[in-house]
Amino acid sequence: KSTLMNLLGCLDTPTRGRYLLEGVDVADYRDDELAEIRATRLGFVFQSFNLLPRATVLRNVVLPLIYTACPRKERELRAHAALRSVSLDERLYDHRSNELSGGQMQRVAIARALVNDPALILADEPTGNLDTATGDMVLNTFKRLRDAGKTIVLITHEPDVAAHADRVVHIRDGRLYEGAHGGEGARP
């Protein structure tokens, strides 16, 4: 799982085969170009949220834009748009992230992943630290994003979470399989 996420997130390059992101083999990029891709074309959502606890919601979402050439005024506009897309109450934008519930923190993390309008969103166990109702709310957020045309790779060990996906791929013994839980009848 970690190797797959590192490859998809352009943190590593394959030793065999090719990984095309937006039609280009990532092995053709220099390290500085890969860093730019990670900052602008990929969105990361983590199980543990990875928010700055004493920073406001808005500051946490703006953070990725600071590392790009995005003008200061546009940063806040884009952060507000990303937060609206995950249905977070505007009254929470000035709250510190450590004052939020788990579901609210995960929606802030998703908004942060969206703020650069990424080609690909990588979500590693995004419901793992949440209760069922809050997890369903996060999955509904991903469904809305998918319906809006976003590509999402969601890693999970939970079959009920995987059931929300349009396509399910299993990892078994280091190989990827589509369908049938990587067992009998699965296709590599």
Task: Show where each model-derived region lies.
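Short coil-to-helix segment of the ABC ATPase nucleotide-binding domain corresponding to the Q-loop/switch region
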Residues: 55-63
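Conserved catalytic motifs of ABC-family nucleotide-binding domains
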Residues: 117
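Conserved ABC ATPase signature
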Residues: 96-100, 104-105
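Helix-to-loop junction immediately C-terminal to a conserved catalytic motif
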Residues: 9
